[in-house]
């Protein structure tokens, strides 16, 4: 082994395996494009994006880290979302949660 070398297992790594997912149909009713990053709490995205928000509480886009989805004005699309893991606490974003996700409806 070379110092600093990384040895990985053979095969593909499945992202977000075993996590709860939901899909949401989202329409951009604004006059500007809206881009949402991979780890943004989808419940709190720009208000120009119109969709049923309640089921998205505690979910983010199910896409690779560091990537984003762009919604053009007038565009509607269905996206796949994946549940946050770990402590399941959300802070920041638009400040709509600021704490634990459990026990919220």
From Swiss-Prot:
One of its GO terms (cellular component) is urease complex. SUPFAM superfamilies: Urease, beta-subunit. It is an enzyme of class 3 (hydrolase). GO terms for molecular function: urease activity. It catalyses: urea + 2 H2O + H(+) = hydrogencarbonate + 2 NH4(+). It comes from the Bacteria. InterPro entries: Urease_beta-like, Urease_betasu_sf, Urease_subunit. Belongs to the urease beta subunit family. Pfam families: Urease_beta (PF00699). One of its GO terms (biological process) is urea catabolic process. This is Urease subunit beta. Its EC number is 3.5.1.5. It is found in: Cytoplasm. HAMAP family: Urease_beta. Heterotrimer of UreA (gamma), UreB (beta) and UreC (alpha) subunits. Three heterotrimers associate to form the active enzyme. Keywords: Cytoplasm, Hydrolase. Disulfide bonds: none annotated.
